[in-house]
Amino acid sequence: MHYVAIEESRRDLLKQLQERLEARLEPARAAAIEAFARHFYATVPVEDLVDRRLDDLYGATLSIWQFLQHHDPQSPKVRIFNPDFEEHGWQSTHTFVAVLHEDMPFLVDSVRIELNRRGLTVHAIQNAVFAVARDSQHQLKALTSPKDENAPDARESLIVIEVDRHTDAESLAKIERNLHEVLRDVRTAVSDFDAMCGQITSAIQELEKNCPPQIDPDDHEEAIAFLEWLLKDNFTFLGYDEYLLDGNELQRDPNSVLGVFRLDPVSYTHLTLPTIRLV
């Protein structure tokens, strides 16, 4: 019964939003935005919606819809702003963080973790994946639920997060830069994920061929079992590289680098192993 009441509250609120859209916008635009809102707000906790004035929900919906209109899938889009009634037509006591990105794993958690790392309290998270079609100039042509019949092939993830209000422009710009760096890390790790798993598979196959005489057979089998366990979705591979034994020194093989290790080494000095002298 509680679930039914919650969904009835959601439907009532979205109905009010639909009526407001139809009263203020031309029919085709109102219908497109209403369809977007129905999907975007489908999983948002009702209390996050009912706490807003209808005018603020209307303004937020239009603002997010406008944010979606242009997006190059090869370049993530990040916007951080403080809604102001005079400037945006709606208001909030929070700072809004909006992210539009080609859909892939780890996006929401990575953005949330970065905001938490910066000491920002997250008050609400709204996330939805859309099927989209864009023209050659990256303008939005169609946007639907991925479950819709004949939905476009491309998928984009929209993330909207409300955090503590920050008014310092320099601070907001720094948050935006940091989020771009985090999203770069995500794209790099995800794009190389299959290749990293392939390297682990190759290592397993190599180990299965023979056990070096100086290695205890039980330890050898345990190492193989551990690598196999990692591949069964028990570990998230973010980076990979190899070290070659040259005399009594280990040298990093630059051709083996995958994932986040491919990025600016200055940003990953804490991940880069120094040359190690064996004794």
For each feature predicted by the language model, list its residue ranges.
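Short, well-structured beta-strand/strand-turn elements
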Residues: 119-126
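Charge-rich interaction surfaces and accessory domains that mediate macromolecular binding and assembly
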Residues: 1-92, 96-100, 113-116, 128, ...
